[in-house]
């Protein structure tokens, strides 16, 4: 956090009250002004050691009515940074991934196509859904689904302040959650922990699993036991969130991470830089409207990862079949995983 505060030259720090102590310490180490830290939550908070509630930043109603939100042109939306998510490797400091407004909108639209393939989406005909938000909101996966996709599709999301497995099961039961967005460790818990059978999870019709490799054996076990369809997807911070996904209309049990999202190109490259054939292994390279702009203030890392013509070298080794389904089979370069979520 210290590195991120310094690296972005942040002007405001919004902190959930339970994390205030950690944030204040990081801000101190980064030389960040304490009066620029605000508590951020649904309910108003009393000042704690001089840290005020975020609502104290807000202007008056009169000032709000006079304010004109800037509108980005299509060109500006393509080049203007909307968010910087940090992606760590095994060595060195985390790298800030610059994602544009265009990247986010594109990835939402691409993902919607895969979700509703074969049953075009309209608000009138879309099935009633309820989601449970427990993925970290600092992670691209949580941002896209818990915030962006939910807003776009007008799906209610019940957001957990922290992940506790029994609370997770109880929330599914109480709120009749219909769709889950998970990483493999959650499916391991569903498969192995005895608490899983003590709650009614029948409302869940399907789950999307990403952020780390999932074995087809675990996928089959959870799918069979809980009568839910589990679809895999592949992505990374540098592609906003996703680039490959099994369409929701397909119940795949092969362990595939799916097919390319619309308007996404792919090459699999061997160690000599040559494109491989169907069924052969190669480094996954992606090009599309969801590929990030650059790494924040890290020109060398950008040059090493994104080619001048827009190809992103992912570091993942994959193969594909004649139908365009992909399997991730190895990692070309070492990666770092935290709490079951791949972060590079």
Go through each PLM region and give its residues:
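Adenylate-forming
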Residues: 96, 107-112, 169-171, 187-194, ...
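Structural core segment of the AMP-binding/adenylate-forming
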Residues: 1-60
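A short helix-loop-beta submotif of the ANL/AMP-binding
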Residues: 1-12, 29-30, 129-130, 148-158, ...
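ATP-dependent adenylate-forming carboxylate-activation enzymes
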Residues: 1-3, 17-23, 155-175, 184-186, ...
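Conserved AMP-binding/adenylation subdomain of ANL enzymes
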Residues: 105-130, 137-179, 192-193
